[in-house]
Amino acid sequence: MGRDTIAEIITSIRNADMDRKRVVRIASTNITENIVQILLREGFIENVRKHRENNKYFLVLTLRYRRNRKRPYRNILNLKRISRPGLRIYSNYQRIPRILGGMGIVILSTSRGIMTDREARLEGIGGEILCYIW
């Protein structure tokens, strides 16, 4: 049975966010690097570093928190894996769902790489819906 690396990074980020940890370490693959770059560009994470340990590469993510008077509160509210190895979900560009009326993002795997729902609509291409973030 193969590993679902997308589900692993979503679970790692969600668990660290719920436990209010600022740093998350995940395994580095091409897919995880592309997803992390989208999260960085959209402002859900603050910083990314590539770390090498025993000939294996890891990504070290710094989560973004907003501060108020009492304590820091979370920036990422929810992450949800949609298409999984046992049930793939595909969509054309016209039927890509809008999360919270456009406030959240959908990450898609397309023929032109991994991108957000806004980028896919602008380019007029659909693909596999990987996850929702809102």
Curated annotation (Swiss-Prot):
Keywords: Chloroplast, Plastid, Ribonucleoprotein, Ribosomal protein, RNA-binding, rRNA-binding. It is found in: Plastid, Chloroplast. GO terms for cellular component: chloroplast; ribonucleoprotein complex; ribosome. GO terms for biological process: translation. Pfam families: Ribosomal_S8. One of the primary rRNA binding proteins, it binds directly to 16S rRNA central domain where it helps coordinate assembly of the platform of the 30S subunit. Part of the 30S ribosomal subunit. This is Small ribosomal subunit protein uS8c. It comes from Nicotiana tomentosiformis (Tobacco). The lineage of its organism: Eukaryota, Viridiplantae, Streptophyta, Embryophyta, Tracheophyta.
